[in-house]
UniProtKB/Swiss-Prot annotation:
It comes from Mus musculus. This is Iroquois-class homeodomain protein IRX-2. Belongs to the TALE/IRO homeobox family. Residues 196-210 have a biased composition (Basic and acidic residues). The keyword DNA-binding applies. Residues 177-220, 262-373, 420-461 are annotated as: Disordered. GO terms for molecular function: DNA-binding transcription repressor activity, RNA polymerase II-specific; sequence-specific DNA binding. Its main location: nucleus.
């Protein structure tokens, strides 16, 4: 491959390997020959052949420094050691030698731990820098790890030297009674990393106390969330409260909420005893979804007062804060876990109703305003299951889930009211009908269009007979 006369070609390896060590110890110790001078004169930092550093050496033996020949390259490859190779070869052998014999160490931190180049004793400049930092931080003369690294790079000392210097300086100031910082309950001879860890623990405890003070001032839905569930937190104070991770036990405002709701425990004892008699222990998968997440997740803004009234008016819907948490805590609020856990535990027990009445009837009977949501919110499912569930059996594997939820009266398909003034909302009679139906609820029924409530439960068809006509769902 030929290049023009004035083209200074260098391989990519030669630019990185021969430009910097040209003035290093290895290059100065070796005999200065024509090929070494010419490769250095053609480097990136001295591209001109007439540069002052190499004029005397480069002019001998060649008519011009730019007369490149193949025999000169072969002679250079044969006659020089591996770390000073020809700029024309691929540097497969010269690369490792040059990297291992680099006289400057790494670029990030030039003085390594076992490198003999770092200073064993601190100079006046280094101690002046450390003293300046100490004078600026007299109230807290404990540098962090990042500050120690910064000071070590500036003063060209190691981290051990910097830590030892600060420990000695603090001990010296303590002996001279010039302490301007709060003493620590530990000896100064211990490692400084432990001091950093204890200081970070103190800062985290202060932040936790500040967080509890601010979270105690939170108002609105956080009080109801903490009273209803055992592990939900008040994230912000503007009304949008998010549920915690399932692994967290209680959030910061849980203790204050327990204190505030202790006066309600006496009133709730009777309802809680009735709940324990009627219903099995409630699963965790259904606790944060009753009356709390439904108003937050409802698409219509009118559904919020109905869900809020369902969470506020009956005292039985609140579990006492002192109740022991259940043993199983799933990590995800998945639909499958809700279905599998609630099949064996059908009733949540929001009030002292009859055992045959399903859990869906009580939140619906707590009072839905006429302008409420057109679709009822299930107490076990926080999100609205509108009308897509009849087709789960056709397209997905949710057929068993659909049948099970319909058997409990959790999926209700309401009809259009006879009078135009009424709106579509959850009816207790429909819920009780579906609950009393039992095993017959899985059969397909047909009633005349003038009839009342028609729960369409046939999952094999593409439309449901609702009210006065046929409405297609696809």
């Amino acid at each position: 491959m030929s290049y023009p006369q004035g083209y200074l070609y260098q391989a990519p390896g030669s630019l990185a390997l021969y430009s910097c060590p040209a003035y290093g110890a290895s290059a100065l110790a070796a005999p200065r020959s024509e090929e070494l001078a010419r490769s250095a004169s053609g480097s990136a930092f001295s591209p001109y052949p007439g540069s002052a550093a190499f004029t005397a050496q480069a002019a001998t033996g060649f008519g011009s420094p730019l007369q490149y020949s193949a025999d000169a390259a072969a002679a250079a490859a044969a006659g020089f050691p591996s770390y000073v190779g020809s700029p024309y070869d691929t540097h497969t052998t010269g690369m490792t030698g040059a990297i291992s014999y680099h006289p400057y160490g790494s670029a990030a931190y030039p003085y390594q731990l076992n490198d003999p180049a770092y200073r064993k004793n601190a100079t006046r400049d280094a101690t002046a820098t450390l003293k300046a930092w100490l004078n600026e931080h007299r109230k807290n003369p404990y540098p962090t790890k990042g500050e120690k690294i910064m000071l070590a790079i500036i003063t060209k000392m190691t981290l051990t030297q910097v830590s030892t210097w600060f420990a000695n300086a603090r001990r010296r100031l303590k002996k001279e009674n010039k302490m301007t910082w709060a003493p620590r309950n530990k000896s100064e001879d211990e490692d400084e990393d432990e001091g950093d860890a204890s200081r970070s623990k103190e800062e985290s405890s202060d932040k936790a106390q500040d967080g509890t003070e601010t979270s105690a001032e939170d108002e609105g839905i956080s009080l109801h969330v903490d009273s209803l569930t055992d592990h939900s937190c008040s994230a912000e104070s503007d009304g949008e409260k998010l549920p915690c991770r399932a692994g967290d036990a209680l959030c910061e405002s849980g203790s204050e909420c327990k204190d505030k709701f202790e006066d309600l425990e006496d009133e709730e004892d009777e309802e809680d005893e009735c709940e324990r008699d009627l219903a099995p222990p409630k699963p965790v998968t259904s606790s944060p979804l009753t009356g709390v997440e439904a108003p937050l997740l409802s698409p219509a803004p009118e559904a919020a007062p109905r869900g809020g009234s369902g969470g506020k008016t009956p005292l039985g819907s609140r579990t006492s804060p002192g109740a022991p948490p259940p043993a199983s805590k799933p990590k995800l609020w998945s639909l499958a876990e809700i279905a599998t856990s609630d099949l064996k535990q059908p009733s949540l027990g929001p009030g002292c109703g009859p055992p045959g009445l399903p859990a869906a009837a009580a939140p619906a009977s707590t009072g839905a305003p006429p302008g409420g949501s057109p679709y009822s919110a299930s107490p076990l499912l926080g999100r609205h299951l509108y009308y897509t569930s009849p087709f789960y059996g056709n397209y997905t594997n949710y057929g068993n889930l659909n049948a099970a939820l319909q058997g409990q009266g959790l999926l209700r398909y309401n009809t259009a009211a006879s009078s135009p003034g009424e709106t579509l909302h959850a009816m207790p009679k429909a819920a009780s009908d579906t609950g009393k139906a039992g095993s017959h609820s899985l059969e397909s029924h047909y009633r005349p269009p003038g009839g009342g409530y028609e729960p369409k439960k046939d999952t094999s068809e593409g439309c449901a007979v609702v009210g006065a006509g046929v409405q297609t769902y696809l």
